[in-house]
Every structure is written in structure tokens, then in C-alpha cells.
Regions:
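Membrane-embedded translocation segments of transport machinery
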Residues: 41-133, 141, 170, 181
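Cytosolic juxtamembrane amphipathic/interface segments immediately preceding
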Residues: 14-32, 75, 138-143, 190-196
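Membrane-interface interhelical connector segments
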Residues: 172-199
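Juxtamembrane interface elements at the cytosolic ends of transmembrane helices
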Residues: 1-19, 67-75, 128-141, 246-259, ...
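Signature of multi-pass transmembrane helix bundles
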Residues: 1-63, 152-153, 298-305, 320-323, ...
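Hydrophobic core segments of alpha-helical transmembrane domains in multi-pass membrane transport
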Residues: 1, 33-49, 61-69, 94-101, ...
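Membrane-interfacial loop-to-helix junctions in multi-pass transporters
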Residues: 27-33, 52-55, 59-68, 104-115, ...
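Hydrophobic alpha-helical bundle architecture
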Residues: 74-86, 102-110, 120-124, 132-155, ...
């Protein structure tokens, strides 16, 4: 219901928007240019051999890309990037794309790779739409020109696309996807989903059980997406999320004005955002060292204890950063 409601609101706001506005802060890229670009990209997805996508698959990309980009940008613009349901959109697209491809005779490895390609493209579309919406919202606050921001966003996508392929290849060479060192939980789940639908081996009993659990969780007024993510992600990943949530729970209940509590939360978000970015950079550096067989491991008898101490130390630093008052 939320996604459908958001889509209707986004379409209503689009119909009221005039791209040829005389105001500098309301000038966007021309709509004919955007529509033409979408058509060209859809054709390229169809004809480039790297994407084993049929014309029907390219049409699915256009339809779902338009739908989910509108939803994603609207939700991020209203609430924030933390509420962008990228995983849910990608999985929904993956299921529908697999069923459509199977029904039209595109089966086997070709059909599965095509479905994953379609789901991956939609996942990227939703993620970029949310990020762009966040940037445009920030630009509006400071009085930026939307068309210039949009050109910058396009350049950023091109540059990142040129580098992300190398990073993915590097990670696969270093550890391999689906291994203990690089579980890739979401990718593994998508693989199992596509194989299950194509081979008619999907465990519908488990899926229906999950559906009823989700309904019960919604009735209890618990956000179902974080609940589901916590169930299928490895504990090594969800433990950090839980610990960060515990720190925020404590910080928000320490006495202070509403303004002070908001400032504490904002400082915590900034600090943890830096940790996430730093973890990604360190992961790439470790992958490079692994590929070139450079051993920098410390000879420590109980590495788990050292990791736990560092983890607790980071939580204490996070708490201190949240409670630190501006001078």
C-alpha cells in the first residue's frame, strides 16, 4: 500500500511540474531528452551480448524501472535514504521477470542469467533514484540549480560504473562470492530464488510461512523490512546493526531537549556513515593484498577477543561522539 500510494503521489507531482520553468531553481533536464535516453538504453540492454535479455526483458526493465524509480525517489525525498526498499523492489522484479521469461520460453541458464540481469538493473535504478533524490533535496535547501545537479549525477554514475566492475572482479578473485569470507547473502538468495522458479523447485511452504510471519509482524506494528533483513543476513552483519541501534536507544533516552536529542542522533549518523565508507575502502585494500598474496596478519593467539575489544571500543567512541556538545 505504501509503495502504491507513493507512486500515485509521485505521478501527481510530476504532472504539475514544468521542466521549462523560468525559475533557476526549478529548471530540470528536458523530458524529451530523458525519454530518448531511456529508449536508447533499453535497446542497448537488448542488443548488447553481455546482457542476455530479450525484448520482453528490456520492456520489463523500462516498466519496472520507471515505477520503482518514482517510488524510490519519492520515499527518500519524504523520509530519507534509510527507507529506500531497494532489496524488496529487486526481489519483486526478480520474481516477476523470472515468471515472465519462463512463460515466454526463455528457460535454462539463459533465462536465469537474464532474470538476474533484469533484477540487477532494477536494483541499480532504485538505488540511484534514491541517491539522486537525496542530493536534489539537499541542493534545493541550499538553492542549487537542479539541471546542473542532474548533469553531475549522470557523470557520477558513469565514473562509478567504470570502477565498480573492477571492484567486483577483485573481490571475487580474492575470496569468491558465496564463501565464508564473502557470504553475499542477498546475491545467494536471489540465485536460489531464480533457480527455484526456473526448475519448479521453489519451497513454497517456506515462502508462505514467511508471508504469514510478515503479516503478523505488520499487525504488531513492527517494520517488516528490517525484521526480514535481520532474519536472512548473517549474524556477523546484523550484530553491528543491533549494537548501533542499542547505542541510539540509550542516547535518545538520556535527558535533554528535543533539539539536543536530534543533534546527538545527527552526530551518530555522520560518525557511523564514515565507518561504513571506511569499511568499504578497507575491504578493497584487503582484497588487493589478498590477490597479490601479501600477508599482513598479526600473530595473535585469540583474534576473536581482539576483535570484540575493538568492536566495544568503537561503540564507546560512537556514544562519546553522540554525546559531545558543539562548542
Amino acid at each position: 500500500p505504501l509503495i502504491i500510494r507513493t507512486f500515485k503521489q509521485a505521478m501527481a507531482s510530476m504532472s504539475r511540474k514544468h521542466s521549462n520553468s523560468s525559475l533557476r531553481t526549478e529548471r530540470d533536464l528536458p523530458m524529451p531528452l530523458l525519454l530518448g535516453t531511456i529508449v536508447v538504453i533499453a535497446i542497448l540492454i537488448w542488443i548488447i551480448p553481455t546482457f542476455p535479455v530479450s525484448p520482453i526483458g528490456a520492456l520489463i526493465v523500462v516498466i519496472f524501472g520507471f515505477f520503482f524509480a518514482s517510488v524510490s525517489s519519492r520515499m527518500v525525498g519524504l523520509i530519507g535514504s534509510s527507507n529506500n526498499p531497494v532489496s524488496g523492489m529487486a526481489i519483486a522484479t526478480l520474481i516477476i521477470a523470472t515468471l515472465v521469461l519462463k512463460a515466454t520460453g526463455t528457460v535454462g541458464t539463459t533465462g536465469m542469467v537474464g532474470a538476474v540481469a533484469i533484477g540487477g538493473i532494477i536494483c541499480i535504478v532504485a538505488a540511484i533514484a534514491g541517491d539522486t533524490s537525496q542530493d536534489l533535496k539537499s541542493g534545493f535547501i541550499v538553492g542549487a540549480t537542479p539541471i546542473k545537479q542532474q548533469i553531475g549525477e549522470l557523470l557520477g554514475v558513469v565514473v562509478s560504473a567504470l570502477s565498480v566492475g573492477f571492484v567486483l572482479y577483485l573481490l571475487n578473485e580474492a575470496w569468491g562470492y558465496g564463501t565464508e569470507d564473502l557470504p553475499a547473502a542477498q546475491a545467494t538468495m536471489m540465485k536460489m530464488l531464480v533457480e527455484g522458479i526456473m526448475n519448479a523447485e521453489l519451497p513454497w511452504g517456506l515462502i508462505l510461512t514467511g508471508v504469514f510471519i510478515a503479516i503478523a509482524v505488520e499487525i504488531l506494528k513492527v517494520p517488516v523490512m528490517p525484521f526480514a533483513v535481520g532474519m536472512y543476513l548473517p549474524f556477523s552483519l546484523s550484530a553491528g546493526i543491533m549494537a548501533g541501534g542499542a547505542v541510539r536507544f540509550i542516547v535518545e533516552r538520556i535527558k535533554g531537549t528535543d533539539k539536543e536529542k536530534k543533534e546527538r542522533t545527527d552526530r551518530g549518523v555522520l560518525f557511523t556513515s564514515g565507518l561504513i565508507a571506511g569499511e568499504g575502502i578497507v575491504g578493497i585494500l584487503l582484497a588487493v593484498l589478498t590477490v597479490f598474496e601479501v600477508n599482513i596478519a598479526l600473530d595473535f593467539s585469540l583474534p576473536q577477543i581482539l576483535s570484540l575489544v575493538i568492536f566495544i571500543g568503537l561503540l564507546l567512541i560512537l556514544f562519546r561522539q553522540c554525546m559531545k556538545k558543539d562548542k
